[in-house]
Amino acid sequence: MTARRAVPAVLAGLVLLCLLAGVAVTTLSVRVEGSSMAPTLRDGDRLLPVPGSAGEVHRFDLVLLRSRHQNALLVKRVVGLPGDRIAIVSTPDDPFQVLLQEQGRGPVRRVTARPWTDQARRTGNCCAADGTRSARPELRTVPAGAFFYLGDNPDLSDDSRAYGWGEIARVEGRVGLRGGLLPTSPDLGPAPVLETARGPGSPAPGPGP
């Protein structure tokens, strides 16, 4: 094949690959509905799960969780893992203080995320024994086989505060691609970080799970 003939063939191959990729994204992806994960994810975004990642959770990853409530597929962020102790302290001046003690040992640290700081305005403490909201903040232990999850837009997210602990067995995959972008792209923003807890908010220890 001459170079003149090779160029159209290569271009045709590239077009075919692009078409196949588009079909794959449309067929295999999950469409985001609503704004509970804004600004990280927006309504209409398409997500592709990591192959073979069903039943996996890693701290601060985004996961696709099949909820027992109306069998809905949720897209949320993993915050607490089995054995962790978790609480949310809510005050008028600081309504969304997410506190975490990894594996129930060591210091209680604050989980901070820019979307939470920018968007959280409503007050509400956590956690009750099942991981939902509570009248006062209490550190609760995440049970075996479960995890604590939140949306990046706290005021508009139905997450563990509403539904309780998530079941790892019902995780259908970790989010691996968004509209063809890798999850580490700056477009998705930085992951939450653990910082030294400051301020007067101090959750009660809680009786355990």
Which ranges hold each PLM region?
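N-terminal Lys/Arg-rich, disordered targeting/topogenic segments
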Residues: M1-A3
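Hydrophobic membrane-insertion alpha-helices, especially the h-region
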Residues: V7-V25
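Soluble "head" domains of membrane/secretory-pathway proteins
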Residues: P8-A9, L28-S35, P39-P209
